[in-house]
Amino acid sequence: MSKRKLVLSVVTAFIIVCLFGIVIIEPAEIWSRIKQNNEGMKVGYSDSVVYDGNHYKLLHPIGEKNESRYISLPDLKAITSVETAEKDEELTISYKNKKLTYDNGFIQNCSLTKDDMCGYEIIDGLIYIPDQSVERLGFQIGFFYDKQTNTVSIKSPEEQAKKPQDQELGSTIYVHKENVPAEKYEPRSGIYLGGYVLQDEYIDTSMNTFNKLTGKTHASYFKYVGYGKPFPKEWAEEVIAAGGFPQVAWEPNNGLNEVKDDEYLRQFAKDAGELNVPILLRYASEMNGTWTFYSGHSEQYIEKWKLVHDVMEKEAPNVMMLWNVFTMPESTIDEFYPGDEYVDYVGVNIYNVFYHNDKIEAKSDFEDPLRLLDYVYNTYSHKKPIVIGEFGVTNYTVTDGQHHDDFAVEKITRMYKYLPELYPRVKFIYYFDVNNLVNAPEGRKINNYAITEKKSILNAYAANVKTDQYLSKVEGDPAKSETYSYRDFFFYYGGELYADYKFVRDYLNMDVKESRGNSMKVTFNGKGIDVKQESLKIDKAAFFEKREVKGLPLGEILDAFEVENEIKDGDLHIQIAK
């Protein structure tokens, strides 16, 4: 900015103040702020922005100065669809019925109070707008998840008008396929509703009472059984009498060496087979963590898994083998996978807590239960239906000694309201209805997950599971068609949607290989094309970590191979002929 323009800006500001009697900043301070605005901005923010739940790769980095964040005008236009008009020294930025008009770099009629940023920056010929000015257009600027990740979030006025549990869902990629074989007892029209009540003393551990309170017969309930204990026939009969079928969480808590092809294993399997109802067998779950007696031994784990699978296949064909992990850590999950032919369903346990590991400094209230599902869902749902083996939300924690009823209502509502629509490959979900303050071992009496003790939480659960999409009985004759979905692991850049290469490979069944430079070769039906890869690090759902999305331009790929697709309500629908 030239000295002549600086003087003109100061004089203009002074005249505005005189004419309108607005609270002013002294001329000396105006000069000081103009000088500061010509100094370099600090960087260090993520090169991604989340807008209404979708990831965008920035064309230019976000900067910070005087506690204000600046976003380039080209990025603001690409992300939010604001409109601009320029005439002489005047720039107008508008969104819906709001607009900012700049004259010589300053907003017309700006009050110039100490809390306002009335000007923009010009760096390397680009205009940068401060967050306060963007918010004048009705947007809300903050951090996505938590400021520790340095990822800026922008919410449109329309997004802000929604309830918290409905915000920042983002877009979904759907893939529709025909002639898809179903797994054992797999429903195609909804999700089997399940629960765990054996430690809910408030309802005397009664499945019938739980069904009555929630207004819905649950299709399944589960029970923990230690390896070496007999098959729980009496309890299984109680589940059947309550209108459901059992899930057995079978845990080799003395280690994997005790798992052998012996009389105990065979009898357990025979007892399960004699029940003549579907049984979901969650054998040796959460092995990806460090807290089980069978963690850290992936080769032995797979060997024993295959043994159990083969025995069940022979003695109890009604058993569905559920391979079930915990949400974190992700890095160890795949090394325990036994192989497609040995697994019927893939599951994950998900918990929303206010603090991690009873640490007041490890606040985690921002975590989204749906995004906690994304890694397992995106990694495995193209080949196996998905189960949420346990889901729980804290409503009270000893960490801060506070009740968090609103937190529980929000997370439960978000999970059960949107799960059927956004994650059609999820086929079971079990709520963990336990007050751990009473029923957990010492050292784990931290959170209360029970929904039956407080009316507001119970009502939130009941209201969202009452739909026909949550099933109360086993579905027969499943449809041949199936809808797949893919969430979060994609971003927008330069007006193009970039999906992780694994989506192209696994969900579209295309061959993907590295090519020259920063390109990948995609082959489909004998035809090959080279496409440019763009990478972006996005926030993981927990623990302030990042994941790298190696994105491929999806529109370019679909057009090149003439794959049928369309956009509906912001979501991409792809039709795959099979």
PLM regions: where:
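An active-site-proximal structural segment forming one wall of the substrate-binding cleft
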Residues: 258-280, 301-315, 319, 335, ...
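Primary recognition of N-terminal secretory signal peptides and signal-anchoring hydrophobic helices
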Residues: 2-173, 473-578
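Active-site groove signature of glycoside hydrolases
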Residues: 268-298, 319-328
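Glycoside hydrolase catalytic-domain groove-lining segments
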Residues: 234-249, 355-397, 452-459
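Substrate-binding cleft of secreted/luminal carbohydrate-active enzymes
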Residues: 189-194, 278-280, 285, 387-389, ...
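N-terminal carbohydrate-binding/catalytic regions of secreted carbohydrate-active enzymes
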Residues: 193-271, 411, 418, 423, ...
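Hydrophobic faces of well-ordered beta-strands that scaffold small-molecule active sites
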Residues: 193-195, 219-223, 246-249, 279-283, ...
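Aromatic- and acid-rich polysaccharide-binding/catalytic face
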Residues: 334-364, 387-393, 432-434
